Amino acid sequence: MNTVVDTPELMVFTDSAAMKVKELIEEEGNPELKLRVFVSGGGCSGFQYGFTFDEEVNEDDTAFEKNGVTLLVDPMSYQYLVGAEIDYSEGLEGSQFVIRNPNATSTCGCGSSFSA
């Protein structure tokens, strides 16, 4: 059973991130795409974040919806992302999706690796 969560304190999917995902999905021409955010082992701090587009919603995924866009998180990743903010930023260092995670005890300078 899929869980659709509308509770901002569990995870924040910012307007900026949702709008960028919507733009990317429109460029792909496939309205069935959803953004999957995941945590995997690796990176210089033990865990790393990943992003991919997915048409499939797994039975145990948690789905967050914002501005017509769906963000998917698998159960293993969800435990590391509770309370996190998924954002999109554009700056001098380039454009990127950013995760601000209160569960991370340390992060790497690369911004995509953390320890918990």
Swiss-Prot record:
GO terms for molecular function: 2 iron, 2 sulfur cluster binding; 4 iron, 4 sulfur cluster binding; iron ion binding. Gene3D superfamilies: HesB-like domain. Iron-sulfur cluster binds at residues 44, 108, 110. Its cofactor is iron-sulfur cluster. InterPro entries: FeS_biogenesis (IPR000361), FeS_cluster_insertion (IPR016092), FeS_cluster_insertion_CS (IPR017870), FeS_cluster_insertion_RrpA (IPR023063), HesB-like_dom_sf (IPR035903). Binds 1 iron-sulfur cluster per subunit. The keyword Iron-sulfur applies. PROSITE patterns: HESB. Keywords: Iron, Iron-sulfur, Metal-binding. Belongs to the HesB/IscA family. HAMAP family: Fe_S_insert_ErpA. Required for insertion of 4Fe-4S clusters. This is Putative iron-sulfur cluster insertion protein ErpA. It comes from Aromatoleum aromaticum (strain DSM 19018 / LMG 30748 / EbN1) (Azoarcus sp. (strain EbN1)). The gene is erpA.
